[in-house]
Amino acid sequence: MIIPNLLPNLLSNLLSNLLPILPSILVPLVGLLLPAITMVLSHLYIQKDEIL
């Protein structure tokens, strides 16, 4: 009986520990990393010599 209850308890503990720090991970990701990737990709696209 201990083994079937282990996985739900482990998942609930993981989620309860992860949820408070999730904004600390997502805010820099969305605010800094995604715009940086977008700027690099748009720069590479603009600098292509091909005309479609």
Swiss-Prot record:
One Pfam match: PSI_8
Keyword flag DNA repair: no
InterPro entries cross-referenced by the UniProt entry: PSI_PsaI (IPR001302), PSI_PsaI_sf (IPR036357)
Single GO BP term: photosynthesis
Principal location listed in the UniProt entry: plastid
Swiss-Prot/TrEMBL keywords: Chloroplast, Membrane, Photosynthesis, Photosystem I, Plastid, Thylakoid, Transmembrane, Transmembrane helix
Protein topology in the membrane: Single-pass membrane protein
Annotated GO CC locations: chloroplast thylakoid membrane; photosystem I
Transmembrane segment boundaries: 21-41
Location in or out of the cell: Plastid, Chloroplast thylakoid membrane
Function text: May help in the organization of the PsaL subunit.
Family, as annotated: Belongs to the PsaI family.
The protein's name in its UniProt record: Photosystem I reaction center subunit VIII
Source organism: Pinus thunbergii
